[in-house]
């Protein structure tokens, strides 16, 4: 997809009020995305950000590829209020496939492998490597240089290994959430909903405006 096509696709993301996400180039580098992605109208994506297919970037999120790069695989969902950033001249941020970044989480200058759930409000700091099939529990703080083992749950402040993950949890939680967010994003790509009838059901509605 060309830079012009990408910019158009991002800027034309669906919204109920006609709003558009804030998409900005940094040093001439424009964010790009794959096929069938959704970007909420008040999300912000800037600079050297590359998204794969079927990704979703939700309301009030910020992806700042200004001081370094951000790379996202396929089927990554960045939920409401989350922030993804990187560190100047040190660490970019790389996120694999089938990854969920929970509401208000912060992911900064790290590597997250495939099939990972970063819980709501969690913080993943610079030079962290989160192995595949893992969960970072809600509210956890994963300190710099931590190596999260594959197939584990890390929790706490600072985050430590809590336990190994069963296959049932991988399929029932990590995969389920990623699949659901692909489905949710599809709801916003449907044709615009019909105009609702005026309050009270009569007249042209001009005298029924809620105050």
Task: List the model feature ranges, each with a label.
Residues 2-29, 66, 72-74, 80-87, ...:
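Glycine-rich hexapeptide-repeat left-handed beta-helix
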Residues 100:
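Short proline/glycine- and basic residue-enriched helix-capping loop/turn segments at helix->loop/beta transitions
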Residues 32-77, 81-87:
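A positional/architectural concept
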